[in-house]
Regions:
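ATP/pyrophosphate-binding catalytic subdomain of soluble kinases
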Residues: 749, 753, 788-791
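Generic alpha-helical transmembrane segments
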Residues: 704, 779-794
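Conserved cytosolic headpiece of P-type ATPases
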Residues: 1-726, 733-734, 747, 762, ...
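Membrane-water interface at loop-to-transmembrane-helix junctions
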Residues: 728-747, 773-781
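A C-terminal functional module that forms or caps the active site or interfaces directly
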Residues: 797
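Long hydrophobic segments that form regular secondary structure
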Residues: 757-758, 763-764, 774
């Protein structure tokens, strides 16, 4: 049986039951039901049981299970109940279940975000061009391809206008393949030589074309090669990696302390019986449990997941978690002008030259389509098609009179495109592009129906008209023509774009987005440098830059040609002088980004075209455009703007700062709590009594502390979030005095807890004495006081330096978490069955009052230290 590449386009269309105008919506729906979505099969997701077992392999839970095993042996030998063992195992199981639930939620959130950035393609349905998700493609669909598009499925080419496709993912060959429509001979033509086919997994890098889908999903060549698409593990952020390293360091440190305490206790006991060894080992296990912040990883993951979801609701879709942290460090934002700083709603407001000829040239040398409700396509091209329609020149009518039969597609290097059309008298070429580039290739101009030589005087006059439009912040394009008796054999740009006849200029306005000016001001207040990059004329760029507040003077703008005259060393010295770059090409963007990065600045870069991919990859944060962006740029971007709006980047930066601040608050809270537990167990052991058992510490770590820590992750941004400079990306977890804060707060809670233990013991015996061994009343008081102390301390953590009583907003979730944790603590103490299981004694109102008074001390003491720190910071300035 002949392959698709051995048959003509018409034969392939007939076999697929399709036609050049595509399928109807009804046919497509019927085929979708039959063939299924155009997707590659994913690896099977692990079952709930597999996920649960994976959770149980966590080192922290293994330590807890070891503690349960030791406790079981101790209780069996001493004849005590296994209540403590049961409680530890319940905590382990609960933690594993919560881990599975959270993992499932995070996976669902990521899948939802992936849906938001799902690949789309242009397809003909019912004879009209529509944009659909690539997964909805079926055999027989006719797709339209242009530079920057990812080929959505395997297809036979119907048209190719200088189209080149990069097929490295399939063939390993990085050089793009020039595509053609003609048939191929031979039964087994190698995939890389099938020039009339296009394949899923490849990318259009130049030109445009049209293809009929022959194989979707797993029937594609990519599907045959891949078989099953392996799922990649979710990458960890730098913060998560630092926390993992911190966990390993803490584990080693605690192991050393445990060994010391184990030996110390045995030496003090003076006997080496099994019972003594086991009880001493349990003290060491208590210390290990106290030191491990069991809820920390979960809290960080949850806060990141919630933050990423919130950002997506604000039109910033995070594709890589690392971007969340990097956003908070951003120092420079390099942004395209069109569509990002402006509304991307182009309208022709001025023109020069013969109107009818200019409108015809602009409409035909154009890939936008005219539909009932206006033009569809790239906004600039759509504006030109609408301009022609307003003159009574509808594009479909023009195309029927002058059908396209050749072209040199747009290229950002040439800054123009050309198309060739058949006429009654031969062939005509229309060229449109940047005025200076088009004019440079012209030798004549048309006026009043005559073709006249292009003198220097006329050339100067045209450039003056261009400058006058550019000074009004208009985007200006020029049109030219060239006549042929016969269709040119060679249709390369260098062959077509010479000896042109100048027609005229069209000036378009793209209004500035109303919210961008305020966003630029917010950037400056936050210590972020906004930089505008555009292909427009320098005068246009300067006018818009001034209006937005990006620059104050034309000397702060530079052109791409001027950049070409600078070495990298010279650019490094000059890069801080410029905030507006005009007439730039994609390679200039890479140089600009790299110059800023060599300065040590964390840089974000936006882009939409296929040629922007290198600069987006070079930046610390690559930002793709969700509306106008190509699949290539979206795939390499760290973040995609679903509204193509500069203000969204600023919002994302603010959210990134807030998320990082909140994670630090949660870390400080949890580590200060763990510090107090470690110090408490350690010093209590040295003093000769048991402060708390492992099960008590587990309850505090997993129940009492986790809910407030999660609530801190939802804290609103502080008033100075966007008025302080970006943080240094090299800063560690404990930067900004966090390490000192954790230490002194841990010591404070330790002193309060041990004091409470001693008071509880003295109230039990009726006189003052230092406790020895185990005091049930002392342990109960220590548990109650430490729990309340850490609950109150979570309120302190709403701000690292500011007084919590000065914050303008309220964290209702934190209030709920504090009340909930307090209620659960009370439940453990007051419900007899649970209290007995934990080894607690009944608590009197007096003891409640003492514990409450002691725990409350954490608020004024921390507030006082914050006040001293604020005054010290002011003096330092």
């Amino acid at each position: 049986m002949e392959k698709e590449y051995n048959r003509s386009p018409q034969e392939v269309l007939e076999e697929l039951g399709s036609c050049p105008t595509g399928l109807t919506a009804a046919e497509a729906a019927e085929r979708l039901a039959k063939h299924g979505p155009n997707k590659l099969k994913e690896a099977e997701k692990p079952s709930l049981l597999q996920r649960f077992l994976t959770q149980l392999k966590d080192p922290m839970l293994l330590i807890l299970m070891a503690a349960a095993a030791v406790s079981a042996v101790t209780n069996a030998l001493s004849g005590e109940s296994f209540t403590e063992v049961f409680i530890i195992l319940v905590v382990v199981l609960l933690n594993a279940v919560l881990g599975v639930v959270q993992e499932s939620k995070a996976e669902a959130a990521i899948e939802a975000l992936q849906t938001m950035t799902a690949a789309k393609c242009k397809v003909l349905r019912d004879g009209h061009q529509v944009v659909i998700e690539s997964s909805q493609l079926v055999p027989g669909d006719v797709v339209l391809l242009e530079a920057g598009d990812a080929v959505p499925a395997d297809g036979r080419l119907l048209e190719s206008a200088s189209m080149k496709i990069e097929e490295a993912a399939l063939t390993g060959e990085s050089v793009p393949v020039t595509k053609a429509v003609g048939l191929l001979t031979g039964d087994n033509v190698p995939l890389g030589d099938r020039k009339n086919m296009c394949y899923m997994g490849s990318t259009v890098v130049y030109g445009r074309g049209k293809a009929v889908i022959t194989a979707p999903g797993m029937d594609t060549e990519m599907g045959k090669i891949a078989g099953v698409l392996a799922q990649t593990e979710q990458e960890q952020t730098p913060l998560q990696r630092k926390l993992n390293e911190l966990g390993k360091t803490m584990s080693k440190l605690v192991l050393g302390i445990c060994v010391f305490i184990f030996i110390f206790d045995l030496v003090v006991a003076g006997e080496f019986t099994l019972d003594t060894v086991l009880s001493t080992f349990m003290v060491a296990v208590s210390l290990a449990v106290a030191a491990i912040p069991e809820g920390l990883a979960t809290v960080v993951t949850v806060v990141l997941s919630i933050g990423v979801t919130n950002m997506s609701k604000q039109h910033a879709v995070i594709r890589r978690l690392t971007a969340v942290e990097t956003l908070g460090c951003t120092q420079v934002i390099c942004s395209d002008k069109t569509g990002t700083l402006t509304q991307n709603k182009m309208t022709v407001v001025e023109h020069t030259g013969p109107t009818e000829l200019l409108a015809t040239a602009m409409a035909l040398c154009n890939d936008a389509a005219l539909e009932e409700n206006g033009a569809i396509g790239e906004p600039t091209e759509a504006a030109l098609v609408n301009f022609a329609a307003a003159q009574g020149l509808k594009k479909p009518v023009l195309e029927s009179r002058q059908p396209r039969c050749g072209e040199a597609p747009f290229d950002s290097g040439r800054k123009m495109m050309s198309t060739i059309h058949r006429t009654d008298n031969g062939f005509i070429q229309y060229t449109k592009g940047a005025p200076d580039e088009v004019l440079r290739r012209c030798t004549s101009y048309t006026e009043s129906g005559q073709i006249l030589p292009l003198t220097e005087e006329k050339r100067t006059a045209i450039l003056a008209e261009n400058k006058a439009m550019a000074d009004k912040a208009l985007r200006v394009l020029a049109a030219a023509e060239r006549l042929y008796d016969a269709l040119p054999d060679r249709q390369e740009p260098e062959d077509l774009e010479q000896d042109l006849c100048f027609i005229g200029l069209a000036g378009m306005i793209d209004p500035i987005r109303p919210e961008v000016k305020a966003a630029v001001a917010e950037c400056r207040a936050a210590g972020i440098r906004p930089v505008m990059i555009t292909g427009d004329h320098k005068d246009t760029a300067v006018a818009i830059g001034k209006e937005l507040g990006i620059i104050t003077d034309a000397s702060q703008a530079v052109t791409g040609s001027a950049l070409d005259g600078l070495t990298d060393e010279e650019l490094d010295k000059a890069v801080e002088k410029y905030s507006v770059y005009a007439r730039v090409q994609p390679e200039h963007k890479v140089r600009i980004v790299n110059a800023w990065r060599r300065k040590g600045a964390i840089t974000a870069m936006t882009g939409d075209g296929v040629n922007d991919a290198p600069s987006i990859k070079s930046a610390d944060i690559g930002v793709g455009m969700g509306i106008t962006g190509t699949d290539v740029t979206k795939n390499v971007a760290d973040m995609v703007l679903s509204d193509d709006n500069f203000a969204t980047i600023v919002t994302a930066v603010e959210e990134g700062r807030r998320i990082y601040d909140n994670i630090r608050k949660a870390i400080q809270f949890l580590l200060a709590s763990n510090m107090s537990e470690v110090l408490g167990v350690f010093f209590a052991t040295l003093l000769g009594f048991t402060l708390l058992n492992p099960v008590h510490l587990l309850f505090i770590n997993l129940i009492t502390d986790c809910f407030p820590a999660l609530a801190l992750g939802l804290e609103k941004g502080e008033p100075d979030t966007m008025t302080r400079p970006p943080r240094d990306s090299k800063d560690g977890i404990f930067a900004g005095g966090l390490g000192f804060d954790i230490l002194y707060q841990g010591v404070l809670i330790t002193i309060i807890t041990i004091t409470s233990y001693i008071i509880g013991h003295c109230m039990e015996v009726g006189y003052f004495e230092m406790p020895k061994g185990v005091s049930d009343d002392g342990m109960t008081m220590a548990f109650l006081t430490m729990s309340m102390c850490e609950i109150f301390h979570s309120f302190n953590m709403r701000s690292q330096r500011k007084s919590v009583f000065s914050l303008p907003s309220h964290n209702k979730v934190l209030w709920g978490a504090m009340i909930g944790s307090l209620a659960l603590t009370t439940l453990v103490l007051e419900v007899p069955v649970i209290a007995n299981a934990f080894g607690f004694t009944p608590v009197s109102w007096t003891e409640y009052g003492v514990a409450l008074a002691l725990a409350f001390l954490v608020l004024p003491v921390v507030e006082l230290v914050k006040l001293i720190q604020r005054r010290a910071a002011r003096r330092a300035k």
